[in-house]
């Protein structure tokens, strides 16, 4: 993780391709890296766990998670080629061998995974419809396979259809600071 934080990789790429909002690049660690690591705080993935990162953009949450869990396998997908190029180049520069970056829409992804992760890509009901086909029925972890999403704001209406099965954890449980007060991790077994 230290290599990611010390490296000018994202800053350099962001000056060429707007992967992270230019006004937010100074908050890279808190708003992107640390936020992504809320998933690692919530679940210690077992070795050989497979994870699909949907709408990864520049590699979040996939790249920080791949660093934290080197014995797990990650597939990062995004439909925008320039974003996948950045994620791929950052992963290569960091020497990450446990992830693959693909330019594709999640609808095109055929593989099965233990978990699907995402950061504020689309409304939860839409995401559930798209990724349900990608969840494996072989379990490796202490919890059932499913969807783990990082989101912010008022999620009441979005989570309402899943209120009986979803587990919602505020990110402020693990991280201090005003920015995390509205951020939540949503787990939905599928």
Where in this protein do the model-derived segments appear?
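Active-site capping/gating segments
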Residues: 154-190
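A short acidic, Gly/Pro-enriched loop at the edge of an enzyme's catalytic core
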Residues: 108-115
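Conserved beta-strand signature within the Rossmann-like core of class I S-adenosyl-L-methionine
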Residues: 139-156
